[in-house]
Swiss-Prot record:
Zn(2+) binds at H77, H234, D238. The keyword Lipid biosynthesis applies. Pfam families: LpxC. The gene is lpxC. It is an enzyme of class 3 (hydrolase). Belongs to the LpxC family. This is UDP-3-O-acyl-N-acetylglucosamine deacetylase. Keywords: Hydrolase, Lipid A biosynthesis, Lipid biosynthesis, Lipid metabolism, Metal-binding, Zinc. GO terms for molecular function: metal ion binding; UDP-3-O-acyl-N-acetylglucosamine deacetylase activity. The active site is at H261. The keyword Zinc applies.
Length: 305
């Protein structure tokens, strides 16, 4: 399996979650072995950032990357789309300091990538594969990883809320599975948190148009949920995006319990800092390519945990 990039430059604009201002995003083809690279345009010039786990400077409302005084926030949905669609090399130009939130999912980014087209390059794809079982745990939340030829995610969430409760999903992530099952799941938050954030000048771009918002009992969005288990699907989306910072796609079997951006990044830093123990660099030849079956419940049906 060879490396890939997009066939043409494509862009969009949208509201920034934090600033509430319009942000311009442009995606460009990139040469082999480039990986994912950000060009962040600010008032003092253009800053180039090839993200790694230790470039994460904040994990509060979203994952924020920073280097040499420049930063870009809410990167996880775009990164999930890039990894989910198996694009290896791409340049991301951003005018401002955050990725547009769009509708709160990765669907718009998948649409952009498909519209740009995917070009197969000449060099073989390089991936990181989990070498041996590893567990990362904090405060009853954990990530367990084991060797696997592909990307399989078993994810469970538990919320003391009648509209969420306990949800689980087990999925083998392929481009088809990502686009059809994961990409459309939106981010979610609680009304009490939104009101607090707005009162403190935060999340000014957040609304019912780009997030699922819940009060103490119900979903407030007029159109309801896209899937009965949209919450766990979005957590898988976030996980894929947060795992995209190694410099190459990550393969393994991941069992995840109630994780979030901070735990995801802590896990990624651990396996990155101890690469010789936990990671194996693998070159995927064309003859080794195989299709992974989608191991997931039918749309809208949680898997019993």
């Amino acid at each position: 399996m060879n490396q890939t990039t997009i066939k043409k430059t494509i862009g969009c604009s949208g509201i920034g979650l934090h600033s509430g201002k319009v942000v311009r995003l442009t995606l460009r083809p990139a040469p082999e072995d480039t990986g994912i690279v950000f060009h962040i345009r600010t008032e003092d010039g253009v800053h180039r950032l090839t993200p790694r786990p230790d470039d994460v400077i904040a994990t509060g409302l979203a994952t924020t990357l920073g280097l040499n005084g420049s930063s870009v926030a809410t990167v996880e949905h775009l990164l999930a789309a890039i990894r989910g669609m198996q694009i290896d090399n791409i340049q991301i130009d951003i005018e401002g300091n955050e990725i547009p939130i769009m509708d709160g999912s990765a669907a718009s980014f998948v649409f952009l990538l498909k519209d740009a087209g995917i070009a197969r390059q000449n060099k073989p794809r390089q991936v990181y594969r989990i070498k041996k079982p590893v567990t990362y745990e904090r405060d009853g939340k954990w990530i367990k990883a084991a060797p696997h030829d592909g990307l399989r995610i078993e994810y469970t969430i538990e919320f003391d809320h009648p509209a969420i409760g306990r949800q689980s999903m087990d999925i083998e992530v392929t481009p088809e599975a990502f686009a059809g099952i994961i990409a459309k799941a939106r981010t979610f938050g609680f009304l009490r948190e939104v009101e607090y954030l707005h009162s403190n000048g935060l999340a000014l771009g957040g609304s019912l148009d780009n997030a699922i918002v819940l009060d103490e009992y119900n979903v407030l969005n007029e159109d309801g949920l896209r899937f009965d288990d949209e919450f766990v699907r979005h957590k898988i989306l976030d996980f894929i995006g947060d795992m995209a910072l190694l410099g190459a796609p990550l393969q393994g079997h991941f069992q995840v319990h109630c994780s979030g951006h901070a735990l995801n990044n802590g896990f990624l830093r651990t396996i990155s800092e101890h690469e010789e123990l936990y990671l194996k660099r693998v070159e995927l030849s064309e003859t080794a390519q195989r299709e992974h079956a989608v191991e997931a419940a039918p749309a809208g049906t949680p898997v019993a945990a």
